[in-house]
């Protein structure tokens, strides 16, 4: 289900990217560790990379997680470490973790700044997408609305 959720979010974002001013790519690979001789170890794969198409070329790391998330107490430290590392590797100042919505309404969660980067505005956001719709079209429209809120 993890991969299916990731693909659904990515394909929906890709479909509506012309409305956002961002270009979305999936499974962008970069090495986490490289020796002085150029030997690569531990490649990383970003679920979705959003890059602004004009201006400052801002990058946003998007990581999808198909697991229960009803509030800030439900996040995993490992997930935040993961997107924080991606932000460092790709020189991004914004990461978004996207989960399916479990309750009847989305949790109200503010953006969090990495403790040592408050002045640099490096932040992590937690978003949910309601997948409990009558049709795939309705679910895609929900993702589209989320995309508009994030990127506009």
Q: Where are each of the predicted segments found?
A:
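Catalytic core segments in nucleotide and nucleic-acid processing enzymes
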Residues: 1-152
